[in-house]
Amino acid sequence: MFYKIAQKVMFQMDPEKAHHLAIASLKATANTPLDCFYAQKFTQAPVEFMGVTFPNPVGLAAGMDKDGECIDGFHAMGFGHIEVGTVTPRPQPGNDLPRLFRLKPAKAIINRMGFNNKGVDNLVANLKAAKSGALVGVNIGKNKDTPVEQGKDDYLICMEKVYEYSAYIAVNISSPNTPGLRSLQYGDLLDDLLGSLKAKQKDLAEKHGKYVPIALKIAPDLSSEEIEKIADSLIRNQFDGAIATNTTLSRDGVSGLMNSNEAGGLSGKPLNSLSTAVIKQLSDCLKGEIPIIGVGGINTASDALDKLDAGAQMVQIYSGFIYQGPKLIQDIVEAYRAR
C-alpha cells in the first residue's frame, strides 16, 4: 500500500528527479525505525551461484544504486543480492538531460544515462560503510573518454579497487549508451579483456586470500553466431558467470507510444521475451559450464520462472521493481520455493 502511494507521487515527477528522491529517502531511512515502510521478511530460498551462497535468487540489477548509497535499504526489502554500479575509475556526469523516460502503458523505461557515477573511490567508501551484510555485486565499466582500445585498463583499475568488498564483479560491455562499448563483445577485444581480467583475478585472490567470481553482462541485440562466440570465449577464459541481458535498442512493443523514439536502451516488459530467448541460446552454448543471471523485462513471478526454465540460475529486476514495487521480490521467491 505504501509503495503504491509513493509510486503515484513519484510518477508525477520527472523520472530522474524521482529517482534521486527515492535514493535520498532510502539512504536517510535505512537502519532506522522508518525502514518499516518498505522492509520485508519472508522465508528465504538459498541458491549456490558462482561458489557463493545467496539467501534467495532475486537480485537488484545494476543502475538503480549506481554509487552504492542504499545497500542497506535495498537489503531490507529482501533482495538476495544488490548489484551496484555501473562504476568507472573516474567520476563522470553521464549524458545530457533529459536521459530517462517512462513508457507507462508498456511498463517500460528508456534510458541513455551514460554511466553517470561518482567514481570508484566513492563507491568503495560506500561499500565499506554498509552495515547490513548484504551480498553486493559491483558492475564495472569504462570512462566515456577512455578509448575502446584502452578500455581494458579501466576495468582492471575498477576490479582492483572493489575486489576486496565484492561478492562478485560484473563486467559491463553491453550498455548501448557509451560510444563503442559494445564492440568489446566481439573477437580479439573480448578475448583480451576476459583473459586480462582472469589474470588480475588470480593476482587479487592471492593478495586478499579470497576468490571473488567475475561475470560478463551481455546485450540482447546479438545474433546466434555472436552468442556462440561469446559463450566460447567465456568457456575458454574460464569465466565464472554470465548476466543476460542489458537493455535493447529494439523498439518492438512500444512503437507509437510517447517517448518511444527517444535514443537509448529500452528496459521493462517489452524486453522480456527477447531477454529470455538470449538466455536460452546462451545456456545451450554454455552447456552448463557457466551459470547465468537472467535479467530483462521481469514483471511477474511467472516471468522470472520463465528465465530460470530457459537456463538462468538467478534473476535480477529493475524496471519491474519500479512498476510493481518490493512485493515483486517476495512473489518471485515464493514462486521459486514452490516450483
UniProtKB/Swiss-Prot annotation:
Pathway annotation from the record: Pyrimidine metabolism; UMP biosynthesis via de novo pathway; orotate from (S)-dihydroorotate (quinone route): step 1/1
Enzyme type, top EC level: oxidoreductase
GO biological process, any: 'de novo' pyrimidine nucleobase biosynthetic process
Subunit structure: Monomer.
UniProt-listed Enzyme Commission number(s): 1.3.5.2
Cofactor(s) the protein requires to work: FMN
Family the UniProt entry places it in: Belongs to the dihydroorotate dehydrogenase family. Type 2 subfamily.
Chief location: membrane
Catalytic reaction list: (S)-dihydroorotate + a quinone = orotate + a quinol
Cofactor annotation comment: Binds 1 FMN per subunit.
Catalytic machinery residues: S175
Alphabetical UniProt keywords: Cell membrane, Flavoprotein, FMN, Membrane, Oxidoreductase, Pyrimidine biosynthesis
Localization: Cell membrane
Organism: Shewanella sediminis (strain HAW-EB3)
Function per UniProt: Catalyzes the conversion of dihydroorotate to orotate with quinone as electron acceptor.
Membrane topology, from the record: Peripheral membrane protein
Pfam families xref list: DHO_dh
Gene Ontology CC, one term: cytoplasm
Name of this protein: Dihydroorotate dehydrogenase (quinone)
Keyword Amino-acid biosynthesis recorded: no
Binding positions (substrate): K66, N111, R112, M113, G114, F115, N172, N177, N246, T247
Record gene name: pyrD
UniProt cross-references to InterPro entries, sorted A to Z: Aldolase_TIM, DHO_dehydrogenase, Dihydroorotate_DH_1_2, Dihydroorotate_DH_2, Dihydroorotate_DH_cat, Dihydroorotate_DH_CS
Binding site for FMN: A62, G63, M64, D65, K66, T86, N139, N172, K217, T245, G268, G297, Y318, S319
One term of GO molecular function: dihydroorotate dehydrogenase (quinone) activity
